Amino acid sequence: KAAYDQDNLYFFIQTRDPITPYTDPNWMLLLIDMDQNAGTGCLGYDHVVNLEVPSETETTVKAWKNNAWMSIGAAAYRVSGNGMEVAVSRALIGASAGSTAFDFKWADNIQDLSDVAEFGVNGDTAPNRRWNYRFCVALE
């Protein structure tokens, strides 16, 4: 699920089993394609959340720049049982107030973020394999 307000984009995921500790490797990655262009970013994703997780309430947000993931800021998150919420600053990832459209994907325990085959081979993804969720708000 995704939602937004003036300041943040919010993401929620619910898993079948309790979510593992944030200290696990390759834990609960949130991949965001802000420009909805598969030809930009890493495998089309412009931002990744949770590539490095310093605490049980704060995580990192990284952007794909010069063929590498670069830290650009932090995001708040909470885990309770099998649910996880993340709040990402719109300003941090370039989500303008006038337009709210992006693609996103969750990936847990994939081994190589640069290999698209990982989405079908290792770990779990939502949605499956190379599919993305699309979030779009119609402006009135």
Language model features with spans:
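Localized edge beta-strand/strand-to-loop motifs within extracellular or lumenal beta-rich domains
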Residues: R78-A97
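Solvent-exposed, conformationally flexible loop/turn segments
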Residues: A97-S99, N128
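A structural detector for short beta-strand units
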Residues: D46-H47, N82, W131-R134
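A short, structural micro-pattern
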Residues: D24, S80, R129-W131
